[in-house]
């Protein structure tokens, strides 16, 4: 960020000392809270102390921008300024990406500072107009309040949530949870919670556990007083928010006592009762956790569901980034919601698939929606919210934007009506009938706007009430036109005097600072220098701005008349805005339909434009079916420029191959394989097509993952402890209908302990839970579990190696990997030759040691393999004994016997790994 963009903070000595004294008197704050001070009425901002150093390092990336106030040495306060543009970008990054809190301080009088605005990741109300002014909201900042209770020795979780930025909705839920609170974790994922309000009760064991989950899910924790959860006024408060004709006491949600307690805390935290514009605008909903597939935080990361800061501009690194071809911000928000709320109802999934299929097959309709219609829809929720407040300086412009949406609706409806395929009835129900309803209900709004607003002026980006709507308005407008008619001749006169062609080298312009003025290039600036009739206004990169006394007077007159027109029309504007605000409910409903249409078209677009087009999966009802995928691929990886993706088949069958152990070299594709099955399952339950040639899937109630230790060490948790915590959560929350993904287990402790735990956990899942499970492991000995549990199947990623190199095939095949490729992979990674040689020597030493301590380890071969191999050896030796007696002890004849017997038993030897290895060692 350029230093020249940084404003100068100029304070006299007294003001500087006074501010420093005030600043040092402020209470301490967490590092994750930034204090920003408004300067010159909001023209620019300043930050101080640690916050200034943060800005210098992260925004300007230089300490040269730091200025010290209040003296020198330890007494000095490091300070830094931000232009308004930079401050807005800084706020957006702090709140939406860094998940920091913000305090914006404003000055009253000469030296009385107070907090003017507070904002946090889940409560953006105070700053949303600032940070979203030129940017639509692509994420939903949800804040949730939670309270735990116990009944009949069971843990109950009550929660209430709200999104004040993109929806006017209060949601509540209450459910039983286990001692790892895995259902609560799933709730955080499903709702995309950014901030959680909890009671400040210290020493509560369950509360500490709850906070640990919040931290794992990157949710900001806000503590409030225990009394804020009091429900004394909850009925009247909620009734005021819901509006007339609705009584919360008659709703089933009112009986959820824990949830109502959380609703009380949430209403107080968000200050909903103190803002009349909220009253009568909210609806209450009940969130049913069981309607959607449960995801834990580890699964969200394992499946690359949402973008991470490391992705940068590479959108295809996450599933959201890959699928987000939406043309509207409301579509992007709904896509995020759908990805975190995969459906459990087969009819609902099939209905979505049918709609996606329409746009998948009809190229013309898909292109028409994306290129001609959807891109023209603004965020109607934000527009409705601004209109309800009614105090926006751009209120008339917002009304016009709503009007432009209304007049486009018939075109959208006509484009959709062209479809005449097998899903026509569903198409009619989901889109066409709803659009007809919106067109009918919004017709009076269209008529009112056309009657009251000067739509011709809109073409010149002017937003005003029609002059003929009021006599005084008409008179003022006539005077404005008279002045405007004199402006052009004055500009033409100047052009003639200077010998420059108007609109070529001489420009006639208007802006908010200088009004009407002229501009010529800096090369031609000499033509007006030292000539009194020309008044220079400013020199810019684009040229020199100037005026004349006549032009200045005309511009001033026009400005005054325009101001009078604005004053006269202000009451009419209020009436128009108030009228349009009554349609907010219809606009919100339309917004939801547009978002749904946008996501479905996006699903179809991505499905058809993938390197290999996706196909529609077949799903069975919950509790039935298998996972059979033909040539499945990872949708994100196949989009990478430098990747030629190898597709793999998948076969998870009930009673046959429920628990699959995948062995093979690092970097060989184990992790990708198990993750892509999770991704395909999630996509299918979202209603999207999947990256497979064919796909048969069952409905999973959850995807649970144990992958990598991540940044656990940064939180004071060892790798092993992180593994055990995640695995314990899986064991407690998994069901027969879950999909479990385990990518390595037991690496954080000794080899023998790690193997023992991996074996015990695998056996428990395979025999007790019996969920479909994919376990990628470096413990090759774990494959022996298939001899004890018939539903365990062994797979391996194929690799070809010789003494010098390894070729990773990325192909998953049945059977076990009987060879370690660690040193080969290190060679691929260009490790120094000395390190490689030392590794080989140490590996050889360990192999010798392993020979001596083999009885301590699980057998390398199954009992059946050893028995079959021994039988082959026994038969071979019996035949050799018989045939060798006929060779009379001659060496040449003996070799012929051996060769003949080798050919006889070649097929059996090749099919038994125990014999093959024995021959290699011989």
Which residues fall in each region the model found?
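Basic, polar low-complexity surface loops/patches
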Residues: 1-340, 347-361, 382-389, 451, ...
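ATPase nucleotide-binding head domains, primarily ABC-like/P-loop NTPase cores
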Residues: 252, 256, 522-556, 599-922
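A conserved P-loop NTPase coupling/switch region
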Residues: 44-69, 156-162, 169, 182-187, ...
């Amino acid at each position: 960020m350029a230093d020249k963009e940084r404003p100068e903070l100029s304070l006299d000595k007294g003001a500087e000392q006074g501010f420093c004294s005030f600043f040092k008197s402020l209470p301490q704050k967490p590092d994750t809270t930034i204090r920003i001070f408004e300067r010159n009425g909001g023209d620019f901002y300043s930050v101080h102390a640690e916050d200034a150093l943060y800005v210098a390092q992260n925004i300007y990336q230089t300490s040269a921008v730091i200025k010290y106030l209040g003296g020198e040495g330890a007494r000095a306060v490091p300070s830094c300024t931000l232009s308004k543009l930079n401050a807005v970008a800084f706020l957006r990054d702090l709140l939406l990406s860094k998940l920091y809190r913000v305090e914006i301080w404003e000055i009253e009088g000469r030296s009385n500072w107070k907090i003017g605005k507070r904002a946090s990741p889940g409560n953006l109300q105070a700053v949303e107009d600032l940070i979203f002014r030129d940017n639509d909201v692509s994420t939903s900042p949800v804040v949730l309040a939670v309270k735990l209770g116990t009944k009949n020795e069971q843990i109950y979780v009550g929660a209430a949530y709200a999104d004040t930025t993109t929806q006017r909705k209060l949601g509540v839920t209450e459910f039983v949870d286990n001692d790892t609170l895995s259902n609560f974790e799933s709730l955080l994922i499903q709702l995309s919670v950014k901030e959680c309000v909890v009671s400040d009760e210290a020493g509560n064991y369950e509360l500490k556990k709850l906070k640990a989950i919040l931290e794992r899910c990157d949710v900001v924790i806000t503590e409030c007083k225990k009394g804020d959860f009091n429900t004394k006024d909850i009925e009247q408060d909620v009734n005021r928010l819901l509006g007339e004709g609705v009584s919360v006491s008659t709703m089933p949600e009112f009986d959820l006592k824990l949830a109502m307690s959380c609703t009380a805390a949430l209403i107080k935290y968000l200050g909903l009762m103190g803002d009349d514009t909220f009253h009568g605008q909210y609806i209450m909903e009940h969130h049913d956790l069981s309607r959607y597939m449960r995801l834990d935080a580890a699964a969200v990361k394992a499946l690359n569901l949402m973008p991470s800061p490391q992705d940068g501009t590479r959108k295809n690194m996450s599933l959201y980034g890959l699928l987000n071809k939406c043309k509207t911000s409301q579509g992007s928000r709904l896509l995020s919601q759908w990805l975190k709320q995969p459906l459990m109802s087969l009819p609902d999934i099939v209905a979505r698939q049918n709609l996606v299929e329409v746009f998948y097959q009809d190229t013309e309709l898909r292109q028409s929606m994306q290129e001609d219609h959807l891109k023209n829809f603004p965020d109607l929720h934000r527009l409705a919210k601004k209109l309800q407040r009614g105090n926006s300086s751009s209120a008339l412009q917002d009304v016009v934007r709503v009007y432009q949406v209304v007049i486009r609706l018939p075109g959208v409806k006509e484009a959709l009506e062209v479809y005449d395929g097998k899903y026509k009835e569903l198409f009619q129900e989901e889109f066409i009938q709803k659009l007809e309803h919106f067109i009918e209900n919004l017709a009076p709004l269209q008529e009112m706007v056309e009657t009251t607003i000067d739509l011709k002026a809109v073409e010149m980006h002017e937003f005003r009430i029609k002059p003929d709507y009021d006599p005084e308005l008409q008179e003022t407008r006539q005077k404005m036109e008279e002045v405007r008619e004199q402006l052009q001749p004055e500009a033409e006169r100047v052009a003639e005097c200077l010998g420059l062609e108007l609109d070529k080298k001489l420009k006639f312009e208007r802006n908010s600072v200088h009004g009407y003025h002229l501009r010529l290039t800096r090369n031609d600036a000499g033509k007006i220098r030292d000539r009194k009739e020309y008044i220079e206004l400013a020199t810019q990169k684009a040229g020199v701005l100037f005026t004349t006394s006549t032009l200045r007077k005309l511009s001033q007159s026009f400005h005054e008349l325009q101001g009078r027109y604005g004053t006269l029309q202000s009451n009419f504007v209020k009436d128009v805005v108030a009228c349009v605000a009554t349609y907010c409910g219809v606009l919100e409903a339309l917004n939801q339909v547009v978002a749904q249409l946008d996501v479905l078209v996006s699903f179809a677009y991505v499905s058809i434009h993938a390197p290999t087009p996706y196909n529609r999966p077949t799903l069975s009802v919950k509790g039935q079916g298998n996972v059979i995928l033909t040539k499945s691929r990872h949708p994100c990886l196949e989009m990478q420029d430098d990747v030629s993706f190898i597709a793999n088949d998948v076969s998870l069958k009930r009673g046959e191959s429920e628990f699959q152990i995948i062995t093979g070299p690092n970097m060989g594709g184990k992790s990708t394989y198990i993750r892509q099955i999770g991704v395909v399952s999630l996509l299918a339950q979202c209603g999207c097509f999947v990256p497979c040639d064919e796909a048969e899937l069952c409905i999973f109630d959850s995807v649970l993952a144990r992958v990598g230790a991540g940044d656990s060490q940064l939180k004071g948790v060892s790798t092993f402890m992180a593994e055990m915590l995640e695995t314990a959560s899986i064991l407690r929350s998994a069901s027969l209908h879950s999909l479990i993904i385990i990518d390595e287990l037991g690496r954080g402790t000794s080899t023998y302990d790690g193997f023992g735990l991996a074996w015990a956990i695998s056996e428990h899942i395979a025999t007790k839970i019996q969920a479909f499970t994919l376990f990628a492991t470096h413990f090759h000995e774990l494959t022996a579990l298939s001899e004890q549990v018939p539903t365990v199947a062994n797979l391996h990623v194929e690799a070809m190696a010789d003494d010098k190199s390894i070729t990773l095939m990325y192909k998953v095949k049945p059977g076990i990997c009987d060879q370690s490729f660690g040193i080969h992979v290190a060679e691929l990674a260009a490790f120094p030759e000395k390190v490689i040689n030392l590794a080989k020597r140490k590996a050889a030493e360990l192999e010798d040691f392993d020979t001596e301590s083999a009885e301590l380890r699980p057998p390398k071969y199954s009992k059946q393999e050893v028995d079959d191999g021994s039988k082959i050896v026994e038969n071979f030796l019996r035949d050799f004994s018989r045939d060798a007696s006929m060779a009379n002890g001659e060496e040449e004849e003996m070799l012929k016997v051996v060769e003949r017997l080798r050919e006889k038993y070649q097929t059996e030897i090749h099919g038994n790994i125990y014999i093959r290895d024995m021959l290699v060692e011989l």
